[in-house]
Amino acid sequence: MSAEERLIELEIRVAEQEKTIDELSFVLTEQWKTVDQLSKKLNALTNRFLELEEQAAPDVPVTKPPHW
């Protein structure tokens, strides 16, 4: 293999690696967007659950049962 052929082969590999890095970067960005969206939804659902729990649970004093 001549020096020119080796250089061409290396340039091809670098180009393929750059393409792979760009694709992985895009996928990672999309996944972070999804994680952020899911995190916001989870926080909203948690807050809603706590609100409903407060509305549903009567204020019962914590006392020992009579048989204690």
UniProtKB/Swiss-Prot annotation:
<comment type="similarity">
    <text>Belongs to the SlyX family.</text>
</comment>
<dbReference type="InterPro" id="IPR007236">
    <property type="entry name" value="SlyX"/>
</dbReference>
<protein>
    <recommendedName>
        <fullName>Protein SlyX homolog</fullName>
    </recommendedName>
</protein>
<dbReference type="Pfam" id="PF04102">
    <property type="entry name" value="SlyX"/>
</dbReference>
